[in-house]
């Protein structure tokens, strides 16, 4: 659910209409094509769900460690702290604390239990020690937000000071945008889930030999897109719809139902051996999505995910509306 996305106010759309002028045989053939397509989609979802169940097992048990887990282990092995000078302040930080700052900064807000899982390989004790040190130095702030079931979730955000310190640390690529504080508290849990979704997708990319080099949230995508649109729309001689199509293509996006579709998150990654940069646009759909909105995201080419408890409902909608898209479980 991209921030600012309003579900359509018109009636839910209907699936592809049958051509009444076609022969019964053609309609039967089209019906079988739809059935086979949905069977392929369901098969892919079942295989993905099975991989998820296997991946949730502990490393060192029935599966080898993931590349991310191996990198984290190397970071955790370095326990000494280094002095970092920022103007008139000196911070004492070890690599795992810098890594935690980057994780929180890239996603604005991160659940504490998710940070332990993905940035500390489940070592909650080490994470709590790091958070205490970061908090004492005024670099992070702990906040409690409500999840979709209205249960409290402990989260972390960067403070302005933490954001500035991270910017000066040179621990990130210069083009990687970072954030501090809660911009829209009502949407905070959605951002929390994007952090987990990011690691799910990036683990899959790395499992196929790729390397994620940058992540862009919809905040950044919208900022760049709208700035480009505003600049070009100053030329009144150009057709607005033509401009919209051209700008969307320039940003690797599509216009569907006369609107530029914006994903929740874009991962940029490189594949060996060419190291050419590829992108993957992902959308975290919720139970509030109407079929028309879900269809627009699918037609835009986004990889669609949903919480485990909501994926089944969205898949039923997909089947009823004959949408040609896989819905993965988060």
Where are these regions (language model features)?
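Flexible coil/turn residues that form the inter-helical turn or adjacent wing/linker of helix-turn-helix
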Residues: 108
């Amino acid at each position: 659910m991209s921030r600012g996305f309003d579900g359509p106010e018109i009636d839910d759309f209907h699936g592809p209409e049958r051509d009444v002028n076609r022969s019964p045989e053609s309609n039967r053939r089209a019906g079988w094509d739809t059935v086979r397509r949905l069977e392929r989609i369901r098969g892919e979802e079942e295989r993905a769900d099975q991989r998820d169940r296997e991946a949730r097992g502990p490393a060192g048990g029935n599966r080898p460690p993931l590349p991310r887990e191996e990198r984290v282990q190397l970071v955790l092995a370095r326990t000494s702290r280094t002095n970092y000078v920022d103007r008139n302040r000196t911070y004492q930080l070890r690599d795992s604390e810098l890594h935690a700052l980057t994780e929180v900064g890239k996603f604005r807000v991160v659940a504490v239990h998710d940070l332990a899982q993905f940035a500390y390989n489940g070592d909650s004790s080490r994470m709590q020690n790091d958070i205490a040190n970061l908090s004492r130095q005024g670099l992070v702030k702990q906040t409690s937000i409500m999840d979709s079931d209205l249960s409290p979730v402990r989260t972390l955000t960067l403070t302005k000071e933490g954001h500035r310190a991270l910017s000066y640390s040179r621990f990130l690529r210069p083009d990687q945008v970072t954030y501090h504080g809660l911009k829209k508290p009502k949407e905070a849990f959605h951002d929390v889930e994007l952090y987990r979704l990011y690691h799910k997708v990036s683990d899959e990319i790395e499992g196929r030999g790729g390397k994620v080099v940058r992540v862009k949230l919809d905040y950044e995508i919208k900022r760049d897109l709208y700035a480009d649109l505003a600049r070009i729309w100053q030329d009144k001689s150009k057709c607005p719809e033509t401009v919209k199509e051209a700008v969307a293509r320039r940003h690797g996006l599509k216009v569907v139902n006369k609107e530029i579709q914006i994903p929740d998150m874009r991962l940029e990654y490189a594949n060996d051996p060419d190291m050419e940069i590829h992108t993957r646009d992902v959308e975290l759909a919720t139970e509030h999505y109407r079929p028309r909105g879900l269809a627009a995201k699918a037609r835009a080419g986004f990889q669609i995910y949903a919480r485990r408890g909501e994926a089944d409902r969205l898949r039923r909608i997909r089947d009823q509306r004959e949408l040609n898209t896989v819905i993965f479980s988060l």
